[in-house]
Structures are given as structure tokens and as C-alpha cells.
Amino acid sequence: MSERSVSKQKQEKRWYTVMAPEIFDRAELGETPADEPEQVYDRTVQTTLGELQNDPSENNTKLTFQISDVGSDTAYTDFVQHELTRDYLRSLTRRGTSKVDAFVTVLTTDDYRVQVQPVAYTTKSADRSQEQAIRSTMVDLVEESAADNTFADLIDSIVEGRLSSAIYNEAKTIYPLRRVEIQKTRLQASPEEVAAEEEASVDVDD
């Protein structure tokens, strides 16, 4: 390929400004290049909550978005995942204490299926029954939150720390806690995907 052809390709490449979803105030996530708009779809973009909010104290929260729509020079994303950094989670671990985690798959009021992973850290070592009670409380509160909220509101309550605070206030009555976090949240299926799965399940049953 000649230098002229390569130069022409570079000139034709367009840059798209990538925007966060509405629940993150359509914040600008950066730019991505492509020859055609179709190439931009499904690309993922990672950032931190600290970068979105211009708050370095929130850099331990990683966010992943996926491009779902493309305009003339703008790419719009959907939320895919929220995750705390390994270094931050490791810093919460103390010798002689207990770490209690759970994996909860829930359906929001607008039919998004989400996996939520809460984790609690005790002040001292808890026994097995206390750990089970804490885990049960975490699961119950995550399920209640999903049953009462849309996908956007659930994600907002997780990212802003309201859900972890609610779990902390409830679970600390079982055993003294030092910290509760939602260590990871992942979108598993959109309403369209959930509906398709349910339809396929009905067909199999028939």
C-alpha cells in the first residue's frame, strides 16, 4: 500500500466523542476513532468514578460502559459493570476478622437482570452462624432494592453507596462490622434479552 493510500485512510478516519449514560449525567468518557460508524458499536470503555466526578478519592471504583448507539460525531453508551479495585479490597482485609461475601442475581422493576456482589468486613472473627446471618441479610436487602427500583436507580444506589450503607446498618445488629461494600455489579441481560430467554423457555416447556 502506498504512503498516499495510508494517508488517505487516516484522513477518512473519524473521531467519536464517547458519552456516559444518563445515570452518569452524560459525562464525556473520551474519544474513539473509526472508519465507519458501524465499527464503533459494542466497543467498551473503562474509567473510574473518580475521573467522572473529578474526585480522586473515588478512583478505587472502576466503571465499564459499552457503546450502543452512534450519532454523527457522538457515541452513546450503556452501563455494563461496576467494580472495586483489588488493591482497595485487599486494604480492607484484616487479620483476625471475617470477610463475608455473596453473589446475588436480581431482576429490576424494568426487567434488567443484574448480578450484585456485596461484601462485609467484621471487626473481629465471626462464627459460622453469624456469617450466614450476615450473608442472608445482604442477599435480602439486595433483592429488596432490585424489586423496588429501576435499573438506573439500582446502579445509582450502588455507586453512590446507599445500598452498602443500608446493608451495614442492618447487618451490624448481627455482629459488629467495620465496612460493607458492593464489590462488583454486572449487567447480565437487558429487558429484550430477558424476554427472549423467557419466550425460549416457554417454547421448550411446550
Curated annotation (Swiss-Prot):
Family note: Belongs to the eukaryotic ribosomal protein eS1 family.
UniProt cross-references to Pfam families, sorted A to Z: Ribosomal_S3Ae
Entry's Gene Ontology BP terms: translation
Annotated keywords: Ribonucleoprotein, Ribosomal protein
Protein name: Small ribosomal subunit protein eS1
Gene that this sequence comes from: rps3ae
A GO molecular-function annotation: structural constituent of ribosome
Keyword check for Translocase: no
A GO-annotated cellular component: ribosome
